[in-house]
Amino acid sequence: MERLLIVNADDFGLSKGQNYGIIEACRNGIVTSTTALVNGQAIDHAVQLSRDEPSLAIGMHFVLTMGKPLTAMPGLTRDGVLGKWIWQLAEEDALPLEEITQELASQYLRFIELFGRKPTHLDSHHHVHMFPQIFPIVARFAAEEGIALRADRQMVFDLPVNLRTTQGFSSAFYGEEISESLFLQVLDDSSHRGERSLEVMCHPAFIDNTIRQSAYCFPRLTELDVLTSASLKYAIAERGYRLGSYLDV
């Protein structure tokens, strides 16, 4: 039985090093899809690079934890910027859901402005769309717009009937122990669960000053090495997986 594998590189637009890494992993590796931060400091650079890589499917990486929002968000920003205090607000059930709804729509329109088309799918920076308060907003929006959504079914809530997503999602290809065997273990675990479609999240990058400031720095370069390995591509095919994107879901 053929299975669909989507290898999605998060953080397109975060920095030039991140952008170049994603393009390299697509051009010479197994990355088939990426998600773009429309408020990222290198988003214009990402748009420019993407024009030469038409095979790369591009979705939207909804941002509520970094940089400046596109709309006024007094209930979520501090000194005009977004940050990781969103977790505290979520725990206190104090998220400004109307502001978040408006910001989602604005980032979506900005994506279309930048790339000239709808995103293939939605996910989010730091998985904030999986917060119980936020997920229904994003799921409803994706269903209404006819685009797919990353959904971790181990956490997921009720899905709209017409919402497209994969049967499986894994964030396990992450951390200090990145290797080809780890990636293949993710596939084998999915196969054992009987999933016919799987998204694997990744963050391949070259190191630049922005990436150096990230808590997750040098493993991004290791990811790039693994994802561009010829032996990995062969092993994926051997396991009955076909590389694709959310357009295939």
Curated annotation (Swiss-Prot):
Mg(2+) binds at residues 61, 125. Transmembrane segments: none annotated. It catalyses: N,N'-diacetylchitobiose + H2O = N-acetyl-beta-D-glucosaminyl-(1->4)-D-glucosamine + acetate; diacetylchitobiose-6'-phosphate + H2O = N'-monoacetylchitobiose-6'-phosphate + acetate. It is an enzyme of class 3 (hydrolase). Its cofactor is Mg(2+). GO terms for cellular component: cytoplasm. Its EC number is 3.5.1.105. Pathway: Glycan degradation; chitin degradation. Pfam families: YdjC. Belongs to the YdjC deacetylase family. ChbG subfamily. This is Chitooligosaccharide deacetylase.
